[in-house]
Amino acid sequence: MKKITFVALAALTITACSSGPKFEVNGDISGADGKMLYLEASGLEGIAALDSVKLKGEGAFSFKQPRPESPEFYRLRIDDKVINFSVDSIETLQIKAPYVDFSTAYTIEGSGNSNKIKELTLKQIALQKNVDDLLATLRNNNISHDIFEDSLATLLNNYKEDVKVNYIFAAPNTAAAYFALFQKLNNYLIFDPLNNKDDVKCFAAVATSLNLSLI
């Protein structure tokens, strides 16, 4: 009898865990027949695989995962292309994208924060392209090192001012503000609290609002 009771209790526990609050991500990826689509958790400690599906036909997909206790970051990945988004409640997100421009031409419904994250992603991509173009101009000897350094500083300062005003200080308690702090340019943090006192203020604003320790 005790053995049966224990087995029943274990089964109930497993059922309770599997049937708890969940979030759902669904949509379709066009032009991706036969491709693998991955759902991954994205954190400071790294990337963790959660689920995957082989896309067929029109590329419809649906993932369900336990709802996080606090805002967390996730991403969809196909090959080396990614779409970043956040989840902070029992949400249903719908993401549609073409395979070719997966990381930039997607649409997302059901999460205002995730749309802000898309805006930040597109801004970072544009910044990286401008820096790459500037570096190519230097390598072709079309500008001096002094002009390169000044132009690079202007690009970076303009970007940071835009993001600080419109994303970090405007709503420091959001996942988008947190996401902005950890964007990179050539694999270096754009906001660097270890080497820039003004950047420390950005981290402090978000940490205070979200009650976190970021630095």
Q: Could you say what each language-model-derived stretch is?
A:
Residues 1-17:
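Sec-dependent bacterial lipoprotein signal peptides
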Residues 12, 166-167, 209:
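Generic structural signal for isolated residues within well-ordered alpha-helices
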Residues 17-166:
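A non-transmembrane, solvent-exposed segment enriched in polar/low-complexity residues
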Residues 166-173, 213:
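Flexible helix-coil transition and linker loops at the boundaries of alpha-helical arrays
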Residues 172-188:
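Amphipathic alpha-helical repeat scaffolds of TPR domains
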Residues 189-199:
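Short coil/turn connectors between adjacent alpha-helices in alpha-solenoid helical repeat scaffolds
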Residues 200-215:
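N-proximal helix/coil linker or "cap" segments that precede and/or mark the start of modular domains
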